[in-house]
Curated annotation (Swiss-Prot):
InterPro entries: Peripherin/rom-1 (IPR000830), Peripherin/rom-1_CS (IPR018498), Peripherin_LEL (IPR042026), Tetraspanin/Peripherin (IPR018499), Tetraspanin_EC2_sf (IPR008952). Belongs to the PRPH2/ROM1 family. Keywords: Cell adhesion, Cell projection, Disulfide bond, Membrane, Sensory transduction, Transmembrane, Transmembrane helix, Vision. It comes from Rattus norvegicus. Homodimer; disulfide-linked. Forms a homotetramer. Forms a heterotetramer with PRPH2. Homotetramer and heterotetramer core complexes go on to form higher order complexes by formation of intermolecular disulfide bonds. Interacts with STX3. Interacts with SNAP25. Residues 45-64, 126-263 are lumenal. Residues 329-351 are annotated as: Disordered. Residues 1-19, 85-102, 287-351 are cytoplasmic. This is Rod outer segment membrane protein 1. It is found in: Photoreceptor inner segment membrane; Photoreceptor outer segment membrane.
Amino acid sequence: MAPVLPVVLPLQPRIRLAQGTWLLSWLLALAGGLTLLCSGHLLVQLWHLGTFLAPSCSFPALPQTALAAGAVALGTGLGGAGASRASLDAAQYPPWRGVLTPLLVVGTAAGGGLLTLGLGLALALPVSLHQGLEEGLQAALAHYKDTEVPGHCQAKRLMDELQLRYHCCGRHGYKDWFGVQWVSSRYLDPNDQDVVDRIQSNVEGLYLIDGVPFSCCNPHSPRPCLQSQLSDPYAHPLFDPRQPNLNLWAQGCHEVLVGHLQGLSGTLGSILAVTLLLQVLVLLGLRYLQTALEGLGGVIDGEGETQGYLLPGGLKDILQTAWLQGGLAHKPAPEEAPPDEEPPKEVLAEA
């Protein structure tokens, strides 16, 4: 069987291959560490923002996959650096001969597979982020008033912290608060005629007002924050509804969070692409180094040329050989014929 992608490697190219693989292995370990840091940071961000993501949103699968891929890439880089350095010394290389094959298999199957999957998720999942945040923020606004309802007691605090931290208001703008009841019913006076009229005028029996929570207010505004009667141009003569950003945060939280999380996922995707490229180069270098040294008995400075290759034969030949070897291994051995029995001694004596 002819080897796949054979390369003739004299002494100096073998040494340069080992040195180059050692350098690329350390770069791969560095890229794997950066992948771990970026995916861990994105996981922490999603843990804090999990309340505002719909349960059906699959975006958290990206940092989880990238975390596993970064760990495998880090291990492959460290193992490749040790193996390539040991290959320069005939006394240190023998212990690594049994490690290289499992390292190549794990690096190719697990590392390459996870990195490719993570890169694909980084390109595809940000699309689902829009819908996940849309549903999550809508639910957060609807449960803002439920401070005494089990399971939603922290909804008000989390939404206030979100708007104050990210300088946003509502889902797509401050007017989103006009369509939900964000004032708890325990603060409403049932004897107040205005409260009764507002509740009765709504089909769902909600108390809706044209106001926003205080967390929507911009503390850097040069004037006092106006929270109520925002749709009435005569209620606040100094307030222009066409320019609410003078008092309130102009952007909605959906736009801010999408930009923030997509920026993190874009950075993570770029690191995954670089890590995948380094992973391929390191695995190729280790494979050619392994096959070249096997032809020299594990001595890199052995005399003469040797041949490095990717596979000992074509995929069809490898599968055929494995099939034949497996068939021979399961084929029962031929039964030995029983030895001829010697005639009894009495018969021999009579003869």
